[in-house]
Amino acid sequence: MPAPSSLQLDMQSGTQSDPQANDCKNRKKPIIIAIIVIIAVIALIARFVVWKSTNHNSGDDSAQNGSSTAQNADEQSNKTKQNDAAKQTKDCATTPDAGLESVEKNGTTMIATVAFSAHACGDTAWKGEDVTISIKDSINEVIASAVYDFASDPMQFTSGTATLELAYAIGQYWRASDQIETKSTSMVVQKGATPNGNAVASVGDARGGANIADSDAERYAQLALSWQLSHDRSAVSGLYDIPTTQLFSRKYGMEVDGKTQQYRDIYAQYLTLRASWPKAVLAWAADYSYYTRYGHEADYYVLLSGEEFGSVADARAWCSDNGFGENDCMAVQIN
C-alpha cells in the first residue's frame, strides 16, 4: 500500500481537530448573544432614565420660569400702582403758567377767573408760598398784582390744569374791570414775594391776596392815572357845554382829611367812586378852560360823574339827592 502523502496527513490531522473547535464555538455563541442583549437592554434603560430625567427637569424649569414670569409681572404691576399712587399724593414743584379768562366787578373788588397750567403737575397739588400773580395789558403794563399763598390751601391740578378765581381789592388793581380787554392781557406768576401786610378777605370762591410793595403800587397807580386820562379824553369832550357834576379834585401831595395824597390814594378814590357811578370820567383840569379861566393853577385831577343834566340847578340837586356833601360834589359845565 502506498504511503500517504503529506497533504493527506495534514487533511487527516485537520479533520480530527475541527469537532473540538466547533464545539467550543457553539458553546460561546449563546453567551455572547446574551451579553449583547443585556448590554442593549441596559443601554435602553439608561436612555429612558436620562430622557425621563431631562423631561422632568425641563417641565420643572418651564413651570418655574412661568411662575417667575408671573411673579415679575405682578411685581411690576404693583410697582406701577405704587408709583401712580405716589404721583397722586406728591406735591408739584413746577410754577404754573397762567392766563386770564374773565374779569368782573364785585362791589369795589375785581374778580379774575384765571386758568393755570403745568403739565408736570398732572393730578397733584401745588403749594406755592408767597406767590405774586400779576395781570399785564397789551403794552406790558401791570394792571393788577397781589401776593397769594397756596401753602395752606393748595392749588389742585387735574391733568395739568386748574381754574381759580382771584380777588383783587382796591390798591391791588389799576384798571376798571369793564375796561380790561381780556384777550390782550398776559399774566406772570412769581414765587418768593414779600407780602405787604395780611391777605384781604376772600370774596365768595375768589381767594384774596396781600398787597405788593408800596413803591410798586405807587408806580402802577401813577401809570394808571395817565392811562385813564388818555382813555377818558373823548368822553370828557362829549360833555362840553352840558351841565354835569364833579365828584372830586385831587393833586399829588395835597392834604385831604389829614392824609397826604399819593397817586395810589387818588386812583383808589377814582375806583371807589366809579364803582357807584360807572359813567365817571377822569380829566386833567389844566386841559380845560373852565378850570383855567381865572388864571388859577389847575395842575390836578378832577373826576366827573358823567351824568348829564338840563341845567346847573338840576346838577346841584343831584349832588344832594345822592348824599354828597357840599365840598364833595359840585355842578360844572365844561367848555
Could you tell me what each predicted segment is?
Residues 1-18, 24-335:
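Acidic/polar low-complexity segments and flexible, solvent-exposed patches
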